[in-house]
Amino acid sequence: AFMSLNGIDVSYDKKKQILKGLNLEVEEGELVSLLGPSGCGKSTTLRVVAGFIDPQGGTFTLDGEDMTKVPVHKRQFGLVFQSYALFPHLSVYDNVAFGLRTRKMDKDVIDKKVREILEVCGLTELADRFPKQMSGGQRQRVALARALVIEPKLLLLDEPLSNLDAKLRLSMRVEIKRLQKRLGITTLFVTHDQEECFSISDKVAVMNGGVIEQFDTPENIYRRPATEFVARFIGFENFLELAKKQDGVYTAPDGSEFLTSMDLDCEKFAGTIRPDDICLADDVQAENVLSGKIGVRTFLGKSYQYEVETSAGVLKVNMGTDHVYKEGEEIRLYLPKDKLILVRR
């Protein structure tokens, strides 16, 4: 792999281990996101790669070279933080040129590179402005241009969009993806925002408690989460206690049987399904059907969410607003076997 972390251990004191033997491989030109809740170790991982934190164990290699002990300023990576960290007393042009000037490059070369990247980032008109005269989105683009102009081997983005409003985040997301693909720069992106992460990444590492729970494409993680933690984190809300009867057939504690289109070889697992994927059963369906009683109803705008009490447990179900069910009404639910996913517990 172009970039790899092998067995990275980081602890801040003897008791608190932040990263536990973390492994991650990134191919050249990929955009890989580290996704997870606060405190899962995603920013620490990025800081190890940047060189701000020395791991207690493990190695970090880039393009075949061991970078574990290389100091920050010699790594020559592009960095963009949540706070942008622009120099307030320098114009956009000078902010972007800063990294090239510290590398003692020829003045004409610097000018050419800066003007090119300003053009790519849509900042040509703003070259003479100062940070305080600009909006958050413009500042973010300057921070990005400054990171990209040095033509880094690796671009590191630490929650770069979390200070922007929702509409701007969307357009910046598209912008980052476009720039990253156009320049072909290998990128590590830290975020806790699932939608942002899925829309921008080639691969996603979902982190929990200092380890990577699942590393896969956004589509695979969304459709087939590997563990209960990953499933809960990306929006699965229904979990059934299941025991294996035979391949593709599982039973709940109440004896009801469920067919699945997958099997898992592990001791502890659960069945999970999204509230959107449960349907009303018609008379034809025989398997994966549960009878239930409507409980609490919540209005979600496009749909209602019902809590339905069944013999296998309470299930959350999203249904259209054209028909409203009343509390206590009896209904039959159908759980399609290709939507019922088995996850490790």
Which positions does each model-derived feature cover?
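The feature captures the beta-strand-to-loop junction immediately N-terminal to the Walker
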Residues: L35-P37
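ABC ATPase nucleotide-binding domain
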Residues: S4, E25, T61, R332-Y334
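ABC ATPase nucleotide-binding domains
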Residues: L31, V72-G78, Q82-F229
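Glycine/charge-rich catalytic "coupling/switch" loops of P-loop NTPases
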Residues: T251-R297, D322-R345
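Short coil-to-beta microelement around the adenine-binding A-loop and adjacent beta1/P-loop entry
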Residues: K15-Q17
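Helix-to-loop junction immediately C-terminal to a conserved catalytic motif
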Residues: A50
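Conserved ABC transporter NBD signature motif
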Residues: G58-D66
